[in-house]
């Protein structure tokens, strides 16, 4: 008879499954970007710069995109 961890400990909670999935996604991020080769302080600097750049891009898009879209709609006379 085969006994699994779920038989002994009961069903895994959704929080545990979510945590494992997030850990797997972070591991994939480290592998795809080759950050696993960096020292922890280098990884922190890289991630900080990445978050800053993405944050600035999202903020700029949020502030300026409505104006540009409205200008395009006026140009093509979709909106008067």
Curated annotation (Swiss-Prot):
GO CC annotation terms, alphabetical: endoplasmic reticulum membrane; serine palmitoyltransferase complex
Domain of life: Eukaryota
Lumenal topological domain residue ranges: 39-43
Keywords assigned by UniProt, alphabetized: Endoplasmic reticulum, Lipid metabolism, Membrane, Sphingolipid metabolism, Transmembrane, Transmembrane helix
A Pfam family annotated for this UniProt entry: SPT_ssu-like
Pathway assigned in UniProt: Lipid metabolism; sphingolipid metabolism
Signal sequence region: none
Parts of the chain that traverse the membrane: 22-38, 44-66
Similarity comment: family membership: Belongs to the SPTSS family. SPTSSA subfamily.
Purpose: Component of the serine palmitoyltransferase multisubunit enzyme (SPT) that catalyzes the initial and rate-limiting step in sphingolipid biosynthesis by condensing L-serine and activated acyl-CoA (most commonly palmitoyl-CoA) to form long-chain bases. The SPT complex is composed of SPTLC1, SPTLC2 or SPTLC3 and SPTSSA or SPTSSB. Within this complex, the heterodimer consisting of SPTLC1 and SPTLC2/SPTLC3 forms the catalytic core. Within the SPT complex, SPTSSA stimulates the catalytic activity and plays a role in substrate specificity, which depends upon the overall complex composition.
Record protein name field: Serine palmitoyltransferase small subunit A
Native organism: Xenopus tropicalis
Lineage, opening ranks: Eukaryota, Metazoa, Chordata, Craniata, Vertebrata
Gene behind the chain: sptssa
């Amino acid at each position: 008879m085969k006994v699994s961890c779920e038989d002994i400990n009961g069903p895994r909670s959704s929080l545990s499954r979510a945590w494992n999935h997030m850990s797997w996604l972070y591991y994939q991020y480290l592998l795809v970007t080759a950050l696993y080769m960096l020292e922890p302080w280098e990884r922190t600097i890289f991630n900080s710069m990445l978050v800053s750049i993405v944050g600035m891009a999202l903020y700029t898009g949020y502030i300026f995109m409505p104006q540009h879209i409205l200008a395009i709609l006026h140009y093509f006379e979709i909106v008067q």
